[in-house]
């Protein structure tokens, strides 16, 4: 069984690599072909969605690494969580942050439209520890490629209609859980117990 599982994991990883490469090839073909430039607008907008821990960040990183430096803008959907500073601290942990209502879709759509029109934006920042929006923002200039990445990046119809390419990333549930625990404990300062409880409750 262990040997079989080992080979299955290898095959899945190979398939994953091939899939990412195919996506990158499609992006390059669309963005830099004469047909694309005459058929679509100059800016290419990509939406990448998928469950937590599914590998969205890896796909995004591979895309950015494969395109010319300085040509990609990343808009993480997590940056557009609604501010929860008005909610008592003890109640914030009960908020389902994987529900569409947790995001400020209007602001995200507005920022994408501003970038399309050639304007810069001030991207909000969000703290996973306090579950609140931070006063600091990130100045973003329009680029050739805009990537919108998040668990529900393809959920909102208005935002989805702005996208030229839509990608959904999936992975085995057990593998996703391992990735989520590693990420949230190391990068977001949460305990393994808290991650497990949240994973079984809302993810």
Predicted regions and their residues:
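Conserved lysine of the Walker
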Residues: 56
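ATP-dependent NMP and nucleoside kinases share a basic, alpha-helical "lid"
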Residues: 135-186
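Small-molecule kinase domains that catalyze NTP-dependent phosphoryl transfer to phosphate-bearing small molecules
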Residues: 186-203
